[in-house]
Amino acid sequence: MRLSPPVAPVAIQTATRLRRQLAAGSQVDASHFWREANSLALPLVTAINDADDEREVTFLWRAASPLRGVYVRLNRVTDKDNVAKGMMTQLPTTDIWHLTLRLPASYCGSYTMVEIPPETPDETVLQLGSRFASLVGKADPLNSTPGINVRGNAQESVLALDHAPAQEEWSGCRAYAGQLFTSEHRLAGQRRRVRLYLPDVPVVQPLGLLVLTDGEIWFDHLGVSAA
């Protein structure tokens, strides 16, 4: 898995200038801003002088039409009850939306960007962090790191900061070598599929038991057996 290190020294001046423009919240030349932004690795990851174990991560979104808002749904950070933390800010009279989050330097997770159309009800916005949200997110088009397929054909972007584990077991497409057993059961009035995977190891080797909910995601889309 490719990690996202802090901005390279050669790009620090450009990154600093863009961040100052965003922090000022004033009008900018949007075309020039995007030319400079596209010369950098995005999202923009910045080291913090007094905290070696944290990073500031700046997400950007270029809107093609007027919006009520844009929401960054970052796994375990802005989802569930933390929707407000993931709401981006628009630079006045531009197509530039931005959000900066302070994250552990070891963070690794998936995220999507959700455009919120004008006239969207407050109730719909409040549900953005739940799994039943009616507005569907998209992968970040400015993030060149390969994404993952979490649900069906929906791609999500990956943010892996520089102190995150490499997790090479998730790299590439590999076939699993163990045995996968599948059975169906009726629980609480619903049919549920249960999967049991036994890795290809000697029978005398002790094994732990890992229980994963949302098995259709882990097995059907993420390929946990091969990992």
Task: Give the role of each language-model region.
Residues 1-62, 169-172:
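Non-catalytic, glycine-rich low-complexity segments
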Residues 52-106, 116-178:
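Aromatic-rich carbohydrate-binding modules that target alpha-glucans
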Residues 70-72, 111, 194:
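Short beta-strand elements bearing conserved aromatic residues within extracellular beta-rich modules
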Residues 100, 112, 195-197:
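Residues within well-ordered beta-strands of beta-sheet-rich folds
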Residues 107-115, 207:
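Short beta-strand segments enriched for Tyr within beta-sheet-rich domains
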Residues 167, 173-178, 182-202:
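Peripheral/terminal regions associated with large enzymatic or DNA-binding modules
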Residues 194-198, 204-217:
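Short beta-strand element of the alpha/beta-hydrolase
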Residues 219-227:
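Short amphipathic alpha-helix adjacent to the substrate-entry channel of hydrolases
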